[in-house]
A protein has these predicted regions:
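C-terminal beta-strand-loop-alpha-helix "lid" module of Rossmann-like NAD(P)-dependent dehydrogenases
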Residues: 1-294
Length: 294
């Protein structure tokens, strides 16, 4: 009977765990839906900014601006490279955090002076233990990404880029391809690449509408680019947040399915043990009855 009680205790424990994993699945499902709606609502504005930058470059192909300065004269070993690394604040999300960390370690293996700006507690703890230089004043959570937070992050990075403290800025995040697949990705924020704005190409003999830029093209770029970078960061934060909860949903679904399988196996063991115990009791009763008859 002790064995039966032990099996029953394990079944109850697994059932309690299954309730937790199922609840976490439902919570992550709700948060992922909210994040995807945020991204859908704000994407048109930032696509419009990208279109305006492309339009300006189309009309002024030789426009010189420090946001496009590749700083080619700086040797690779002396280039100051910043990475915004977007991880989760907690685990239980499958390989989500591992994939981000692995991708950032590839950047750290490149020549240059590296500096990390970590969004998310797990990434902050991971790289701090390995002695990588981290901006300790950069304390941002990944939970419920907002435009205000993205603007603060962009402000910190833009100031350091314009002052010459940084030569390149990347963001490492997880892009959600569909409801079942996400992929860790590196996106270059600064300096801007002209080629990335050349998608809307026009033949040379096609009339190009005249545009007036006041007070100057440089001043217009000074206004548009920071908003564009802010939008890119916000989009990455929201997409990473959705990807995190998508990964957690899949992990919790797998855990729930495993719990169901374990409960089924334990139930079979429980029934066998109970049947054996009943058989043993019947055998003992029959043996006792025969002993009394003799």
């Amino acid at each position: 009977m002790a064995n039966i009680r032990e099996i029953q205790s394990r079944i109850n424990s697994v059932r309690d765990t299954m309730k937790i994993t199922n609840a976490m699945y439902m919570i992550s499902s709700s948060k992922m839906t909210q994040a995807k709606k945020k991204l859908t609502d704000t994407e048109p504005y930032f696509y419009a900014l990208q279109g305006e930058i492309s339009r300006i470059l189309r009309h002024i192909p030789k426009l010189e601006h420090y946001f496009f300065d590749q700083r080619e004269t700086t040797p690779a070993e002396e280039r100051k490279i910043a990475s915004i690394v977007v991880t989760a604040d907690k685990g239980l999300a499958g390989a989500y955090n591992h994939n981000i960390v692995k991708l950032e370690e590839e950047i750290l293996s490149r020549p240059g002076i590296h500096k990390l700006f970590i969004v998310g507690e797990l990434g902050r703890h991971y790289f701090a233990k390995r002695g990588v230089e981290i901006d300790t004043n950069f304390q941002y959570t990944v939970q419920k990404p907002t435009m205000h937070r993205a603007r603060d992050i962009a402000g910190v990075l833009l100031d350091q880029f314009m002052s010459g403290d940084l030569d390149e800025i990347y963001i490492v995040y997880t892009r959600m391809e569909n409801s079942v697949q996400s992929e860790a990705e590196i996106l270059k924020l600064l300096p801007l690449e002209r080629s990335s704005f050349n998608e809307m190409k026009m033949p040379l003999n096609v009339y190009r509408e005249a545009i007036d830029l006041y007070p100057s093209a440089e001043a217009v770029m000074d206004s548009i680019v920071p908003n564009y970078v802010t939008g890119m960061i916000y989009g990455c934060l929201v997409e990473a947040y959705a990807s995190e909860h998508n990964a957690r949903m899949m992990a919790m679904r797998a855990a729930t399915d495993s719990a169901k399988d374990l409960i089924r196996d334990l139930s079979i063991l429980y029934n066998r043990a109970r049947q054996a115990a009943i058989t043993q009791e019947i055998t003992e009763v029959c043996s006792g009855a025969k002993a009394q008859q003799n």
